[in-house]
Amino acid sequence: MAGIIMFAGFALLLIIGVPIALSLGVSTTAAIALDPEITVKVNTVAQRIFGGLDSTSIMAIAFFVLAGNLMTKGGISRRICDFARSIVGGVRGGMAITLVLACAFFAALSGSAPATVIAIGTILYGEMCKMGYPEDRTAGLLVVSGGLGPIIPPSIIMVVYATMTGASVGDMFKAGMGIGIGITVVLVLVVIVFAHKEHWPKDEVHFNLKTFLVDFVKAIPALMLPIIILGGIYSGILTATESSAIAVVWSLIAGLFIYRELHFSDLFNIFIESAKSSAMTLFIIATSTAFAWLFAYAGISAKLVNFVVNMNLSPAMFCLLVAIILLIFGTFLEGIATAVLLVPVLWPIAQALGINVIHFGMIVSIANVVGTMTPPVAVNIFSAASVTKLPMGKIVHGQWPFFIGYVGFFFLVVLIPKLSLFLL
């Protein structure tokens, strides 16, 4: 009965427009109050909500959000775009390849898909359209390339997943780096094919060693950040939380004193914006912790594990089923909400089937990113629409070849665990 109350209540509250975090908390409280078989007190929900945030790893989320906002406003994105363009040279579709590479570089700084779309799109979209690139294809490529944001570390969704499952944040970031490089290669290959098929323009800027070195030097402060973050974590010198705090300090130094495009007067609004974004994410995590605890306490998790195990599904088939479920939920729910709702339900089953926690984490992470590109809840498309001023339908039409490449690589990751684990 508790499970019916929880999921029916959660679905009903979402339908009538109640925020996700409140829906999780209210449905959990209602199940405790209405199911006579649940003997714990209602105030246990408050204890579990507090326990959901009582972790130093959770602090990394707020710091990474703040660091991403500081970098977006601090002039780093322009240096990243110039550096990416200096690498490509005058090939057909060169600016489109530049966009993909710029999104990959910026992803290693921000960890956010919408931030990547806005930061890179603001700089490159108008210039590409003036050069003769199709508006819909350019916007669509921006949407899908922005999906590198939560995959290439640092990644907020990976920190959330690691907190829920006990996985190593460092190992998640290593796997994410490998997956991110793979997706980048796939997108570049798709760009090359369509650049020749649709006769996209050649970049007028040819590769020049002097220009490359100048742009590289200008980009060093930006490129240093992922080295500091990932190097500190991989070497064991820093935890993810400590690295995220250092990322904030370095972002301030780069924006205020090196690039000088960030001003002290900007900081208050950046702090407020970051606090709001972090609070929404943390509230969802907190209430989902209580939801997941009651799910296990009522014995629903154990019953579900036994049911699936008795179906004799292979690990690959289960991973494929999970991928489809996550993609469906991601269409209607924001990415982190999908993860915090389903991971506590699905991970015990995956664990019973012997699925690697990092591989499962990559499935969850990539599926959540795909959700940012699929209407109606498609934050990447909304972000691209705000930059490009194009209608959503035109952006969706333009993104299909890149979206197919992204999703195709996702299913390869689902079925081939070594793609997730080769860097570990």
Question: Whereabouts are the PLM-identified features?
Answer:
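Alpha-helical transmembrane segments of multi-pass membrane transport proteins
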Residues: 1-424
